[in-house]
Amino acid sequence: MIQIDQLNYAYGHKQVLKNIHLEFPENQFSVILGRNGCGKSTLFKLMAGLEPVKDGLIRYAGKSLSDFKGKDRAALFGFLPQFHKTVFPFLVKDVVITGRAAFSRYRPSKSDWECVDQALLDLDIEHLRDRPYTELSGGERQLVMIARILVQAPKVILLDEPTNHLDVYYQSYLMKKLRQLSRQNFTVIAIMHDPNLAFLFADHLFFMRQHEVVKPESKTRITDPKFLKSVYDVEFHEAMIQDKTIVIPDDSWL
């Protein structure tokens, strides 16, 4: 389990995280929702070790994140940022093998390449192995970057807005794959903007507003329009489709 206690963070005088308390269950698919600028991406940077934790504590399995160094950190967290761009036409297999860099001092071993093939197979993209990365669609590129994370064999996969710029097919496909990975001994945590995708695929949902974690009142549904308005500043309506609840923004507020 990942535990975050009394976490605060600021860029200069601008407070971007305020007294964050969160617990992410192990081997589950969790999603963090909230408006732009509420602190979600900064939280991920702290969890991934890209920014130092100065005020508060992040623990994995009861051990402080600051105790994990180098290879141990790489074996703990795999991080997919919002933006990743490759301008050179590297082959997919060569992009994925870079995920083994923390574990190979020299050239990749046979075992490293076997990890690449297995990751591509797990994501059903083995047919892309020898394709130039720059020729792939946005959805295919996202899957390749997730394969790059899988070859690290991390315990936790962090994904910052993984469905951004994807069509409906790849959004659904990717969310299904992330849920499957959480059933294969990965703890998967994603930042997302679409609450309906999160409602349909995630095991656990967390909400942020104005740099803080917010929770619905006891016995209040997470799809409750009043609660969601407090998060997004938008009026919502609930709808039931095949026993699943979705929410629809009300355009009357515009």
Report the location of each language-model feature.
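The feature captures the beta-strand-to-loop junction immediately N-terminal to the Walker
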Residues: 33-35
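Conserved ABC ATPase "signature" region
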Residues: 97, 110-128
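Catalytic Walker B motif of ABC-type/P-loop ATPase nucleotide-binding domains
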Residues: 157-161
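ABC ATPase nucleotide-binding domains
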Residues: 231-254
